[in-house]
């Protein structure tokens, strides 16, 4: 099982991810796209890196707005896996915006 990060580690990591914010025991990114199709295209691009990492985000889509939430459920909070995948998602989101 992945090890939970301390508050100090979380604050350090989130500082390097300006697109993300800490919400309780999760990190979250909200991104708006041109339209619904662009939002869905972006979400589809997340499948491969999530599968490769063995770590899957919670995703909510509302027309052109995508909300991505990461936490490590089996650890009960935030782990390095969350921040590693958040970094990849941030890089992909810059291509699609």
From Swiss-Prot:
Protein name listed in UniProt: Putative pterin-4-alpha-carbinolamine dehydratase
Highest taxon listed in the record's lineage: Bacteria
Single biological process term from Gene Ontology: tetrahydrobiopterin biosynthetic process
Database matches in NCBIfam families: PRK00823.1-2
Enzyme class (EC, first level): lyase
Keyword Lyase: yes
EC number from the UniProt entry: 4.2.1.96
UniProt similarity note: Belongs to the pterin-4-alpha-carbinolamine dehydratase family.
PANTHER family referenced in this protein's UniProt entry, alphabetically: PTERIN-4-ALPHA-CARBINOLAMINE DEHYDRATASE
Signal peptide per UniProt: none
Keywords associated with the record: Lyase
InterPro entries given in the database record: PCD_sf, Pterin_deHydtase
Gene Ontology terms, MF aspect: 4-alpha-hydroxytetrahydrobiopterin dehydratase activity
Record's catalysed reaction(s): (4aS,6R)-4a-hydroxy-L-erythro-5,6,7,8-tetrahydrobiopterin = (6R)-L-erythro-6,7-dihydrobiopterin + H2O
């Amino acid at each position: 099982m992945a090890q939970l990060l301390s508050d100090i580690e979380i604050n350090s990591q989130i500082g390097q991810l300006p697109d993300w914010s800490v919400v309780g025991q999760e990190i979250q990114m909200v991104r708006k796209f041109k339209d619904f199709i662009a939002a869905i295209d972006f979400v589809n691009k997340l499948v491969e890196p999530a599968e490769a990492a063995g770590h899957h985000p919670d995703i909510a889509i509302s027309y052109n707005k995508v909300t991505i939430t990461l936490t490590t459920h089996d650890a009960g909070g935030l782990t390095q896996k969350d921040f590693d995948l958040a970094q990849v998602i941030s890089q992909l989101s810059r291509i699609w915006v």
